[in-house]
Curated annotation (Swiss-Prot):
One of its GO terms (biological process) is cobalamin biosynthetic process. SMART domains: AAA. Forms an energy-coupling factor (ECF) transporter complex composed of an ATP-binding protein (A component, CbiO), a transmembrane protein (T component, CbiQ) and 2 possible substrate-capture proteins (S components, CbiM and CbiN) of unknown stoichimetry. This is Cobalt import ATP-binding protein CbiO. Belongs to the ABC transporter superfamily. Cobalt importer (TC 3.A.1.18.1) family. GO terms for molecular function: ATP binding; ATP hydrolysis activity; ATPase-coupled transmembrane transporter activity.
Length: 271
């Protein structure tokens, strides 16, 4: 269980997170949305133990986080963060060594390291470029290497910061597929993103942050259909939700579902 209880965090005298009560164990994929400066990045750093709240707590397995060296090491094997810029967490020039780095530090046997690295590369669809030098990879490929580096730890929670930023449409589609495969293995994914359409499509629950507080929480369709809340948070609605709220069309979760329903309607009218 990863959650927060009355979480407060200040930078100097300025409160950034204000009494947050969040539970990320309730849904496979949880989306965090909000305008710049709402506290998403600070929340991620609190969840991973990089920052320590002045009041309240991050809860792991129902208990306040242990900030000792041993406690944080244990946490980061179960709660892994993948930053927006993959360059921040890639240190080697060859992919296998980079992904295996954390496992070797933990003293994991080489045979187990080989197995985990191979599984992680398969999961992120990176087997076909695993032998290329990292400096020759595209931005999207580097993102996949960074995710693989988190997956080898067999973390139960994966924090993804802007996973589709800088990706072309094909790369974005691949990233969605990767997230779905991670969740299919029984893991939890928490996504912070300005890609509202991504959050709507892939999340099971959404928290909307505004000035360090929770403005709204619920299922994506319910949250994003609330025009007033979206405007108050400084956000726009996903395009599929706009079609529903502004034109009265059926609310669909994905583009594929939308066009399938439209084709069925067109076929019935033509008949």
């Amino acid at each position: 269980m990863l959650a927060t209880s009355d979480l407060w965090f200040r930078y100097q005298d300025e409160p950034v997170l204000k009494g947050l009560n969040l539970d990320f164990s309730l849904s496979p994929v949880t989306g965090l949305v909000g305008a710049n400066g709402c506290g998403k990045s600070t929340l991620f750093m609190n969840l991973s133990g990089l920052l320590r709240p002045q009041k309240g707590a991050v809860l792991w397995q129902g208990k306040p986080l242990d900030y000792s060296k041993r406690g944080l090491l244990a946490l980061r094997q179960q709660v892994a963060t993948v930053f927006q810029d993959p360059e921040q967490q890639i240190f080697y020039t060859d992919i296998d060594s980079d992904i295996a780095f954390s496992l070797r530090n933990l003293g994991v046997p080489e045979a187990e390291i080989t197995r985990r690295v191979d599984e992680a590369l398969t999961l992120v669809d990176a087997q076909h470029f695993r032998h290329q030098p990292i400096q020759c990879l595209s931005h999207g490929q580097k993102k996949r290497v960074a995710i693989a580096g988190a997956l080898v730890l067999q973390a139960r929670y994966l924090l993804l910061d802007e996973p589709t930023a800088g990706l072309d449409p094909a790369g974005r589609t691949q990233m969605i597929a990767i997230i779905r495969r991670i969740v299919a293995q029984g893991n939890h994914v928490i996504i912070s993103s300005h890609d509202i359409d991504l959050i709507y499509e892939i999340s099971d629950a959404v928290y909307v942050l505004r000035q360090g507080q929770i403005l709204m929480h619920g299922a994506p369709g319910e949250v994003f259909a609330c025009t007033e809340a979206m405007e108050h948070a400084g956000l726009t609605q996903p395009w599929l939700v706009k079609l529903h709220t502004q034109l009265g069309l059926p609310l669909c979760k994905t583009e594929t579902e939308f066009f399938h329903r439209m084709q069925k309607c067109a076929f019935r009218e033509a008949s």
